């Protein structure tokens, strides 16, 4: 009798469990494979992405990086209508500061830095005379004379605008990738949104500059440098909208701020293809 009772009890338990599983499967919750996945997972090639789309009363939250939820340490800039959603407007002596560009420098051998910008006419230094402006820079303790390990200069007017990218590696060797002199670019500072992508290939040691999805024919190179090899440990700040130095009240060209608008700032640890860059432009990303 005891064996029969145990068998009945076991059978009842199995029946209840089976019914429970069946009822769970009929619920409206999606199966595991149906849950949406983040297209930009933290371990992917997109290492830093600030859309500047926040509309809260907290400016640090409005400038958050979407990859690692890396909030800005400081954001004194105004939110404006961007090329897609919201963007930011740079002002004299002000910029957005992050403690790090996440792990971008740790993993980048090749890289792509892409963003949208809007600037009307002649670039100015912080005292109002003609001079360079910086969409971004990495402040660094690497000992480089500039105080940084990477920065981008946009300088000139709508008729002739120079673009200059400086990179210093772990050994404090540096290189300038420039489009200046006879290779300046017209039409960049016309108070309209433009997309810029800077693509470094470790295979060629060259940087391809894309404007609105179109590659510039001038591809400056860094000899046979290969992997970019930036010292991640020495990066002390990622600055959006300023050079790497701190002499803000002077005409110091390394301390000048960006006085236009910016949106969709992205940093990849790979060299995007032309098709990838064109997709960013076409999608206003």
Question: Where are the predicted features?
Answer:
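Sec-dependent bacterial lipoprotein signal peptides
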Residues: 1-24
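Extracytoplasmic low-complexity segments
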Residues: 20, 24-93, 234, 278-285
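Short surface loop/edge beta-strand patches of beta-sandwich-type extracellular domains
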Residues: 32-42, 91-111, 178-186
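Extracellular, beta-strand-rich glycan-interacting domains
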Residues: 48-55, 112-121, 253-283
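Short tryptophan-centered beta-strand motifs in secreted/extracellular beta-sheet-rich domains
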Residues: 115, 191-200, 209
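Glycan-recognition/cleft segments
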Residues: 132-170, 227
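Short, aromatic/His-centered strand-loop micro-motif at the edge of beta-sheets
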Residues: 165-195
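Flexible glycan-contacting loops in extracellular carbohydrate-active proteins
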Residues: 219-260
